[in-house]
């Protein structure tokens, strides 16, 4: 089993009036000893690119697979065991809109859809 934290922006971060087209998230962290096992698990409703220490680790161009979130959500898991090193490491994510965050919100009452609060 694994443990994880849910990461999201505040509700005020991106609205119809102030859109952020491709948020870039970056986190530096220190590792004091060699890693025995580590993985990154990502599940999102839009597309992303993941980088570790400046190297792209994303499996494909459109990650994750496109799905209908009312039925199924896919996740990607990346084994980072051999990629992490003692000392400073940097994880970065470039987020894209995907199918569920397309323009046209005023028409579809976009501000109030359930998945926007995730």
Task: Show which residues each predicted segment covers.
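Accessory beta-strand-rich segments of carbohydrate-active enzymes
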Residues: 14-15, 20, 25-118
């Amino acid at each position: 089993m694994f443990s994880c934290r849910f990461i999201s922006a505040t509700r005020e971060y991106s609205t119809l009036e102030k859109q952020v087209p491709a948020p870039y998230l970056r986190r530096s962290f220190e590792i004091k000893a060699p890693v025995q096992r580590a993985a990154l698990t990502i599940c999102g409703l839009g597309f992303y690119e993941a980088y570790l220490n400046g190297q792209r680790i994303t499996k494909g161009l459109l990650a994750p697979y496109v799905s209908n979130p009312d039925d199924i959500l896919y996740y990607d898991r990346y084994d980072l065991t051999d990629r992490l090193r003692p000392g400073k490491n940097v994880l970065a994510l470039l987020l894209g809109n995907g199918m569920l965050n397309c323009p046209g919100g005023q028409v579809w009452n976009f501000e109030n859809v359930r998945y926007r609060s995730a």
